[in-house]
Amino acid sequence: MAGAVGGHRNGYVRWVRDAEAALAFHFDRHDVADVLLTPRYWEILRLQEDNREVTPLVNQEMEARVADLEELRATYKLLRDRFSQETRRVLVPDTNVFLHYTFFTQAPWSELAENSDPRIIVPLLVLEQLDRLKFSPNQKTAGRAQQVIRALSLMLDDRSATPTNIPRGGTIEVFVDEPGHLRMASEDSEIVEVTRQLTGFLPKPARLVTGDLGMRLRAGALGVEVVAIPEEWQLKATNQSTPSI
């Protein structure tokens, strides 16, 4: 009896670890941990293998996790359908790209994508940062943020997830957080994580577009591709500096 109980428990633990490893390639690792590594999971780990409470706990937990995994499966299918057939290079710009470089509608994005028209995907967090910066005490920063938000609003309308053409070639769209997603404490890390997550659905890796050294280092540590922004894209310095976010 003890062997059967222990086998049930150990089989469940292996299932959780295998599921965590598989899902983390496509979803935010913290979201996956929230789904699988529940308080009941840790309670099961603490129990002795021959404890009679193990089997009912495992059964209850498996039933609950299967329901959660069905939701993840539905999300996975939506993302797979949206990205898996994409042949273009996907670029993920951070917020400073919109603030300190050539205005996004006029930038030659193809230079960052093997001279082909790219698919530009803007994390929702980047839009939220730009929205906050509209009220920056730095007038230059506030003005640029307002211009970007106004242009994006006109282009995307209420179809943020639908790629929209931009003047110099390529398309732009917004990547909205999945339901229940808990963001990372570091906003830079969150943008890097979005790029990593997109790569899991694409035929070729998404590229993070940033001029920020810290973000480049974070991306490199996670194996995320980064593309350097050409110096000629950078706005000329003025007496009124635009601070990084």
Task: Please place each PLM-identified region on the residue numbering.
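Charged interaction/catalytic cores of defense and host-pathogen modules
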Residues: 1-61
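Active-site-proximal, substrate-binding regions of enzyme catalytic domains
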Residues: 2, 22, 80-207, 213-245
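Short, structured coil/loop segments at alpha-helix boundaries
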Residues: 28-34, 52-66, 138-142, 181-191
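Long amphipathic alpha-helical scaffold segments
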Residues: 49-89
